[in-house]
Regions:
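Non-heme Fe(II)/2-oxoglutarate
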Residues: 1-80, 88
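Structured loops at beta-to-helix junctions and adjacent beta-edge loops in soluble globular domains
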Residues: 42-43, 49, 83, 120, ...
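A general structural signal for short secondary-structure junctions and capping/turn motifs
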Residues: 68-72, 106-109, 136, 155-157
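Short, conserved beta-strand element in jelly-roll/cupin
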Residues: 82-84, 102-124
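Histidine-centered catalytic micro-motifs
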Residues: 88-97, 104-108
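Catalytic core of Fe(II)/2-oxoglutarate
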Residues: 121-171
């Protein structure tokens, strides 16, 4: 596994409740990226299924919110993500449009942080790339953290869904 800027390992305390959430597929929120990917030759599914804070979250979700609040993050939001087999999210930078509007962070985007908690051990075909560094072989609880503009990509060419928890906050 590559050496990343900032990684924490969260001791697993969660059960499989995340498997049964009301996941919904939503269009990728940056049509310019989607257009660029199509021009590059990508012809795959660019979205996974999300269950964000507008929907019922697992009973233990508050523990993640508290953990990141204790790290100094403000306005912590969570979104569970199920990436099905064949889903590819090519290299992109998150734009946080709704988050910036909701918490009045226009001009302060540099304070936004993102963490991805891997809810299960790595499976063959599951992939993350962060700032050009490939990441595989993770254990449940592995949590890379990055600044708002870090380029990253994800894919699932494996046989099982890839489950993660996306955490957003600002410092």
């Amino acid at each position: 596994m590559a050496i990343l800027d900032h990684v924490i390992n969260i001791d697993p305390f969660w059960d499989d409740e995340y498997l049964y959430l009301d996941y919904q597929e939503e269009a990728f929120n940056n049509p310019l990226d989607t257009e660029r990917w199509l021009k590059m030759g990508y012809r795959c599914n660019f979205v996974g299924a999300m269950c964000d804070m507008r929907k019922l979250q697992p009973s233990w979700n508050y523990k993640f919110v508290n953990h990141f609040t204790d790290l100094g993050w403000k306005d912590v939001g969570t979104s569970y993500y199920r990436m099905a087999t064949g889903t590819i999210l090519p290299t992109h930078q998150d734009i946080y449009k709704k988050y910036v509007e909701l918490f009045d962070l226009q001009g302060k985007e540099h304070t936004i942080r993102r963490a991805i908690v891997f809810l299960e051990d790595w499976q063959s075909g599951h992939y993350l790339e962060l700032k050009g560094q490939p990441v595989t072989g993770w254990k449940k609880g592995f949590t890379p953290i990055w600044a708002y503009d870090a380029p990253h990509m994800a894919a699932n060419i494996g046989a099982r869904p890839r489950y993660t928890l996306q955490i957003t906050g600002h410092v």
